[in-house]
């Protein structure tokens, strides 16, 4: 049976007072991505006809953050409740489509659950997403009669008997566009909060003889919202634990799944070993037999087979070839590319530079805007001086070059194959193939030198 076309409304107008932040609540991140972006990405998996986003507080920030998303922006100038928010969007509803109502601060909702909910919607009726809570305090209670939902009563309006009910409303629902428009036009704000409750349409549907069905979410956390940083942290931990469990079951070795964060997507081969406190951000791809030491951060990186990344190294937009060794305490900045079997050691920074196969930069060096050939050795303290305060220049180093300790290479400069540069040199001119270059102040010996003494 063909599914009725549907559109989505995401409510994202709230300020989030309890966040104590200038950032709109829905822009606070889970796993490095805003809560509302999680919801949008979930909806985009479902082939929705249109996504309406109801905004209010921090609208300019929201529009900047979501400028590339296919959204219809709907302004809610005053925040007068969920029903009022839906009223602002109702003018865009087609009568013959279903409308799925979601919240921008419930980031872990799944496409599978939402698909079940849409499939459960009765003709001309409503399907609600509910959940059972051990402590339902603060949530709207589901009132049933003969199995069907007849009302949702908010905490402040509930009777003592109704307060004992543990099945609660998640706020997520689906109905036809025609039904929503009809019921939304009848809402009033005669309640303790003086707001327009979307939940009042449940009673309207029942009065007209239309069925209201409830579908329960698979887990509480997928429908849990975040109104403060404590709840936000709980969602983050649940999300990270879920990601860690998926990786463990897929063969990835995590030394401690409670001390691992995935803030993006990960592609991986076999026999991956990840130590504690590793953070993977953006799009990360790991080959086979990759080892990542404790405390490393990788963002938007491609890592080949048999790579050993030692502890406390930080990489961003870098490519690392097979059998390379990096770290500890190494930094690869955007544009760094290490070929196979290369070594980058402790306290080395590589930026917008290509390190050739088998080359080594093992200690306390900076290589920026550079091309380094194969089987080179750059000693401790080597610096490519690539910036004159206004412009950047390139250093080119051929194959089989040896650069001694504490050498400054003043770009632009070319070092040909087989060259050797003595320690302490400052190189300002090109060096020919197989040349030895020494540039240092002659050593002086002063006999009988007396050191200064402190005055008493």
Swiss-Prot record:
The keyword Acyltransferase applies. Acetyl-CoA binds at residues 380, 386-387, 405, 423, 440. The keyword Glycoprotein does not apply. Gene3D superfamilies: Hexapeptide repeat proteins, Spore Coat Polysaccharide Biosynthesis Protein SpsA, Chain A. Its EC number is 2.7.7.23, 2.3.1.157. Mg(2+) binds at residues 105, 227. The active site is at 363 (proton acceptor). Residues 230-250 are annotated as: Linker. Binds 1 Mg(2+) ion per subunit. Pathway: Nucleotide-sugar biosynthesis; UDP-N-acetyl-alpha-D-glucosamine biosynthesis; N-acetyl-alpha-D-glucosamine 1-phosphate from alpha-D-glucosamine 6-phosphate (route II): step 2/2; Nucleotide-sugar biosynthesis; UDP-N-acetyl-alpha-D-glucosamine biosynthesis; UDP-N-acetyl-alpha-D-glucosamine from N-acetyl-alpha-D-glucosamine 1-phosphate: step 1/1; Bacterial outer membrane biogenesis; LPS lipid A biosynthesis. It catalyses: alpha-D-glucosamine 1-phosphate + acetyl-CoA = N-acetyl-alpha-D-glucosamine 1-phosphate + CoA + H(+); N-acetyl-alpha-D-glucosamine 1-phosphate + UTP + H(+) = UDP-N-acetyl-alpha-D-glucosamine + diphosphate. Catalyzes the last two sequential reactions in the de novo biosynthetic pathway for UDP-N-acetylglucosamine (UDP-GlcNAc). The C-terminal domain catalyzes the transfer of acetyl group from acetyl coenzyme A to glucosamine-1-phosphate (GlcN-1-P) to produce N-acetylglucosamine-1-phosphate (GlcNAc-1-P), which is converted into UDP-GlcNAc by the transfer of uridine 5-monophosphate (from uridine 5-triphosphate), a reaction catalyzed by the N-terminal domain. In the N-terminal section; belongs to the N-acetylglucosamine-1-phosphate uridyltransferase family. In the C-terminal section; belongs to the transferase hexapeptide repeat family. Homotrimer. This is Bifunctional protein GlmU. The gene is glmU.
């Amino acid at each position: 049976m063909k599914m009725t076309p549907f559109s989505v409304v995401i409510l994202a107008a709230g300020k989030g007072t309890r966040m104590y932040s200038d950032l709109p609540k829905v822009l606070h991140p889970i796993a490095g991505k805003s809560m509302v972006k999680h919801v949008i990405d979930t909806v985009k998996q479902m082939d929705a006809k249109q996504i309406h986003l109801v905004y209010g507080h921090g609208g300019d920030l929201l529009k900047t953050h979501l400028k590339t998303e296919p959204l219809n922006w709907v302004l809610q100038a005053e925040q007068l409740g969920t029903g009022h928010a839906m009223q602002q969007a109702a003018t865009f509803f087609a009568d013959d489509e279903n409308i799925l109502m979601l919240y921008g601060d419930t980031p872990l909702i799944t496409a599978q659950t939402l698909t079940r909910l849409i499939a459960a919607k009765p003709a001309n009726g409503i399907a609600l997403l509910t959940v059972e809570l051990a402590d339902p305090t603060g949530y709207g209670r589901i009132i049933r009669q003969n199995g069907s939902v007849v009302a949702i009563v908010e905490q402040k309006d509930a009777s003592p008997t109704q307060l004992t009910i543990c099945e609660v409303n998640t706020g997520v629902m689906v109905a036809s566009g025609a039904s929503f428009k009809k019921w939304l036009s009848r809402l009033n704000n005669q309640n303790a909060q003086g707001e327009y409750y979307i939940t009042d349409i449940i009673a309207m549907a029942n009065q007209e003889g239309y069925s209201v069905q409830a579908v329960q979410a698979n887990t509480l956390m997928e429908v849990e919202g975040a109104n403060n940083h404590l709840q936000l942290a709980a969602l983050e931990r649940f999300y990270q634990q879920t990601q860690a469990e998926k990786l463990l079951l897929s063969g990835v070795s995590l030394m401690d799944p409670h001390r691992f964060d995935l803030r993006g997507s990960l592609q991986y081969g076999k026999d991956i070993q990840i130590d504690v406190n590793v953070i993977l951000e953006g799009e990360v791809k790991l080959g086979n037999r990759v080892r990542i030491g404790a405390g490393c951060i990788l963002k938007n990186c491609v890592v080949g087979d048999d790579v050993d990344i030692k502890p406390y190294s930080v990489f961003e937009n870098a490519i690392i070839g097979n059998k390379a060794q990096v770290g500890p305490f190494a930094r690869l900045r955007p544009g760094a590319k290490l070929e196979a079997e290369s070594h980058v050691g402790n306290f080395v920074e590589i930026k917008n530079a290509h390190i050739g196969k088998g080359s080594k930069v093992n200690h306390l060096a900076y290589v920026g805007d550079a091309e380094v050939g194969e089987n080179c050795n750059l000693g401790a303290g080597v610096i490519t001086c690539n910036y004159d305060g206004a412009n950047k220049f390139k250093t080119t180093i051929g194959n089989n070059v040896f650069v001694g300790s504490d050498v400054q290479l003043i770009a632009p400069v070319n070092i040909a194959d087989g060259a050797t540069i003595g320690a302490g040199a400052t190189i300002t001119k090109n060096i020919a193939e197989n040349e030895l270059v020494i540039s240092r102040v002659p050593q002086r010996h002063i006999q009988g030198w007396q050191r200064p003494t402190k005055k008493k």
